């Protein structure tokens, strides 16, 4: 039997002035042979929260962990159920090498807390208060976006019990379909003044309905926050192989940084190759100083007009100057036209 997660119900007051400041009620937990059972009572406020504030309150008696999906530097992600519905639960650990970075990652995940879009993994609920014996800095309950990432599909390693072949999954039509899903998600995020800043195949989930959903917002930033910090340099996380030159140089991020990352991702979908080899610091230097990019010389790009079109789209996305890259809206239009021309 899965075990309920023993955390409290509310985010702190500073997240929203509309939530009252009563102290958290941490339920008692008694061990049983089959797991843990909550003995504490539900705070009276929880059932009465309006829909627009529903994600501030979690009924932890309805949360049951099933198994771990993965782990990283900041914590672990589990498959679970919440009120009987499959969800993913991310726990951010306290004892990481960089506590402040893990705190930033947790709060960055909540940049999308109130957003709803078919191509964005939805935040269901979150909590920062934990029992004294817990190692968790915070917990986020998210929509379960799927068992498989785009990275796994590209490189042939999936968790699916009956994995489909990579070549079958990544025909040109499939690449364009997935690309449009991702660009639709980016267009929505940018319309909400949110930058993802770590877009890559490993952070794109593929649902059972074959829909791509952008996930892992631990590096995300709000545009207004970036503008406020313009006078002082600040750290932006992410994956160096997918980071735009201006990010590697420490400049202020814009939506065009996500477009650059999408260009690398589209190249991966098309070639099924790894973007770079070599030491990270040398790759970063070459990207900035020598305009290094993954190769577009393969037959997949040069042997047909279709390949040439893909080549042009990718090149436009990873232009050295951010202003020369298309925005998500123009990119969406070009991909739709390309897909339509293929019939």
UniProtKB/Swiss-Prot annotation:
Identification of the protein by name: Proto-oncogene serine/threonine-protein kinase mos
GO cellular component, one term: cytoplasm
Location in or out of the cell: Cytoplasm
Keyword line: ATP-binding, Cytoplasm, Kinase, Nucleotide-binding, Proto-oncogene, Serine/threonine-protein kinase, Transferase
SMART domains assigned to the protein according to its UniProt record, in alphabetical order: S_TKc
Binding positions for ATP per the UniProt entry: 69-77, 90
Gene Ontology terms for molecular function: ATP binding; MAP kinase kinase kinase activity; protein serine kinase activity; protein serine/threonine kinase activity
Domain Protein kinase residues, every copy: 63-339
